[in-house]
């Protein structure tokens, strides 16, 4: 069964958890197993979110970093926190072999660009 694991950076500001909840709820309309975890500062951690997916029966997991570009978190921290080798992409859990695939960072997307235009216009209209 497919599990989706959203990765958020995290912050000492508690509102970050609200963002994770909202994105997980949105994706739950399309996928039955969705969890989110943070790289640092907040709970659930990435390993806690992974454990939740595994306990619910996921045997294939797509990890979706909510990051704009590759960097240390993408290349090193996410695989390390999930317990996978960059080349292997498999873990063992209670005798089961679990495949983990990490999606590319968000990068440039016109839909994200549209959100940026919307934010600029909202801010301008509210302040000028």
Curated annotation (Swiss-Prot):
Q: Which Pfam families match?
A: CbiX (PF01903)
Q: Which residues form the active site?
A: 9
Per the UniProt record, which EC number(s) apply here? 4.99.1.3
Residues binding Co(2+) are: 9, 73
Which reaction equations make up its catalytic activity?
A: Co-sirohydrochlorin + 2 H(+) = sirohydrochlorin + Co(2+)
Where substrate is bound, by residue?
Answer: 43, 68-73
Q: Please, one GO biological process term?
A: anaerobic cobalamin biosynthetic process
Q: Name one GO molecular function term.
A: sirohydrochlorin cobaltochelatase activity
Q: What is the superkingdom listed in this entry's lineage?
A: Archaea
Q: Does the keyword Glycoprotein apply?
A: no
The record's PANTHER family line, in alphabetical order, gives:
SIROHYDROCHLORIN FERROCHELATASE, CHLOROPLASTIC
How it assembles, according to the record, is: Homotetramer; dimer of dimers.
Q: What the protein does?
A: Catalyzes the insertion of Co(2+) into sirohydrochlorin as part of the anaerobic pathway to cobalamin biosynthesis.
**What protein name is recorded for this chain?**
Sirohydrochlorin cobaltochelatase
Species this chain originates from: Saccharolobus solfataricus (strain ATCC 35092 / DSM 1617 / JCM 11322 / P2)
What gene makes this protein?
cbiX
């Amino acid at each position: 069964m497919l599990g989706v694991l959203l990765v958020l950076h995290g912050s000492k500001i508690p509102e970050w958890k609200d963002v994770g909840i909202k994105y997980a709820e949105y994706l739950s309309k399309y996928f039955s197993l969705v969890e989110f975890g943070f790289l640092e500062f907040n709970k659930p951690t990435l390993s806690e979110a992974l454990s939740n997916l595994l306990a619910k029966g996921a045997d294939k997991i797509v990890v979706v970093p909510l990051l704009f570009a590759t960097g240390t978190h993408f290349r090193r921290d996410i695989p390390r926190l999930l317990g996978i080798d960059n080349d292997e992409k498999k873990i063992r859990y209670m005798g089961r072999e679990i495949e983990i695939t990490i999606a590319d960072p968000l990068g440039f997307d016109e839909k994200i660009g549209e959100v940026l235009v919307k934010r600029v216009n909202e801010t301008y209209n509210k302040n000028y």
